[in-house]
């Protein structure tokens, strides 16, 4: 498949996200299907939907947006149709709850996604090592009937393995996880070689990191 660099740059996740802190947890909300205000052109609703679905240049669109409907509204309709069997009252929820990325950080190590997203992250220590941890990605799934199926298989990746090896099992999430974690070794090396007395964090977009360190210092002090 041929990558479409134009469609991949439509969204301005860093610009449009909202970050909040509440006691011992933080929340981030990223609106999906909303183009960046800094684009030098105005994308069509079809271009927006194709970007949402990661359409490549040599692929057909997964669906054609009906006239008069926005890509965001259409994506919400598709999501509701998918959820209806498990959530009969899904029409009572707004588009943001079925469309957008809402992710929480519950101090110190649990990161559930909100609304109808099925992803959860958990970080656990590896003995007393300060530069290593276990990152767990937990994907919850609906099941039919009253009997709960057996637990899913626990799959463990080695330090030198890539998330993309799991694409046959978890689909496009393998690419997402790989994209989000491939630079972690470089970040770790940068932190270890950093010569300043403390980190410089942005006031807003790195609110989650600032809040975590604030909570850690509070617990250590007490």
What do the predicted segments below correspond to?
Residues 1-222:
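C-terminal catalytic domain of Rieske-type non-heme iron oxygenases
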